[in-house]
Curated annotation (Swiss-Prot):
This is DNA-directed RNA polymerase subunit alpha. One of its GO terms (molecular function) is DNA-directed RNA polymerase activity. Keywords: DNA-directed RNA polymerase, Nucleotidyltransferase, Transcription, Transferase. It comes from Idiomarina loihiensis (strain ATCC BAA-735 / DSM 15497 / L2-TR). It catalyses: RNA(n) + a ribonucleoside 5'-triphosphate = RNA(n+1) + diphosphate. Homodimer. The RNAP catalytic core consists of 2 alpha, 1 beta, 1 beta' and 1 omega subunit. When a sigma factor is associated with the core the holoenzyme is formed, which can initiate transcription. The N-terminal domain is essential for RNAP assembly and basal transcription, whereas the C-terminal domain is involved in interaction with transcriptional regulators and with upstream promoter elements. It is an enzyme of class 2 (transferase). Belongs to the RNA polymerase alpha chain family. Residues 1-234 are annotated as: Alpha N-terminal domain (alpha-NTD). Its EC number is 2.7.7.6. GO terms for cellular component: cytoplasm; DNA-directed RNA polymerase complex. SUPFAM superfamilies: C-terminal domain of RNA polymerase alpha subunit (SSF47789), Insert subdomain of RNA polymerase alpha subunit (SSF56553), RBP11-like subunits of RNA polymerase (SSF55257). Residues 248-329 are annotated as: Alpha C-terminal domain (alpha-CTD).
Length: 329
């Protein structure tokens, strides 16, 4: 294998050893010396943290109001049931979320295969035990599965959902990554006379929803996309000066005298230190009616004049007043 001394070797996928349906070894070689650790560490981090997948995020169990309780007829307490639900390996096609329902009665184990769902959902580990019923009891459960990435604790979603979340809907820490364990090793490799090359062996275990070869391909794609910015790196030129747009509509910066209100209305506004149209539109009808000597007739006049200019009372203006008005004052 002849080539330029500055030319880098390109690795190839040499072997995929399928140890079990969820456990595989992937070998890539040859790699330049040191690149085994460089690529192995980068791919390991991406495979652990950035692979999209599906996970249980919410659970409703009939008769259960919170996780620190138990359900009559269920051997496990609610917290243990929620932990078992986190082990559910699910894939959802064509949408970002799905709902699984369970209605089981009679003594015996309750497994993932007891859930009912639509055709877009596949439960990869139907034998996974959720809980055990101890007698002739009924267990009714609804589980929400969402698509996501990484690890999202329930506490991070709790504050946003508290006001709308019904009592009894339990939030679950969501680990979306289908990769459960990953390790890599770097061995010596040889190509013709070169013996200083690396061979990268990546060993991974998944929950069965993602093929190991596809996982490597996705991780490499993510890494390449993140490095694109460096490939396209160019000299940073001076940014073009853009014409500054006015922060506010110019009409808001005009004095209220320009509205040509009646003397009574104009005097009432001046008494309240309302100098500019921008000051006026931020007042509400209730606030203006509290102004001495300003009645409903004057209020109607003000509303009509503002409406003719495309304005109204009760408007919100961020960063008002502008610095130019403050300087003038």
């Amino acid at each position: 294998m002849q080539g330029s001394v500055t030319e880098f070797l390109k690795p190839r996928l040499v072997d995929i050893e399928q140890i079990s349906p969820t456990h595989a070894k992937v070998t890539l070689e040859p790699l330049e010396r040191g690149f085994g650790y460089t690529l192995g560490n980068a791919l390991r981090r991406i495979l652990l943290s950035s692979m999209p997948g599906c996970a249980v995020t919410e659970v409703e169990i009939d008769g259960v109001l919170h996780e620190y309780s138990s359900k009559e007829g269920v051997q496990e307490d609610v917290i243990e049931v929620l932990l078992n639900l986190k082990g559910l390996a699910v894939s959802v096609e064509g949408k970002d979320e799905a709902t699984l329902t369970l209605n089981k009665s009679g003594a015996g184990p309750v497994t993932a295969g007891d859930f009912t769902h639509d055709g877009d959902v596949e439960i990869v580990n139907p034998e996974h035990v959720i809980c055990h019923l101890t007698g002739d009891y009924e267990l009714v459960m609804r589980v929400k599965v969402e698509r996501g990435r990484g690890y999202v604790p329930a506490a991070s979603r709790q504050s946003a959902d508290d006001d709308e979340r019904p009592i009894g809907r339990l939030l679950v820490d969501a680990s979306f990554s289908p990769v459960e364990r990953i390790a890599y090793s770097v061995d010596a490799a040889r190509v013709e006379q070169r013996t200083d090359l690396d061979k990268l062996v990546i060993e991974m275990e998944t929950n069965g929803t993602l093929d190991p070869e596809e996982a490597i391909r996705r991780a490499a794609t993510i890494l390449a996309e993140q490095l694109d910015a460096f490939v396209e790196l160019r000299d940073i030129s001076e940014p073009e000066e853009k014409e500054e747009k006015p922060e506010f509509d110019p009409i808001l910066l005009r004095p209220v005298d320009d509205l040509e209100l009646t003397v009574r209305s104009a005097n009432c506004l001046k008494a309240e230190a309302i100098q500019y149209i921008g000051d006026l539109v931020q007042r509400t009808e209730v606030e203006l009616l509290k102004t001495p000597n300003l009645g409903k007739k004057s209020l109607t006049e003000i509303k009509d004049v503002l409406a003719s200019r495309g304005l109204s009372l009760g408007m919100r203006l961020e960063n008002w007043p502008p610095a130019s008005l403050i300087d003038n004052d």
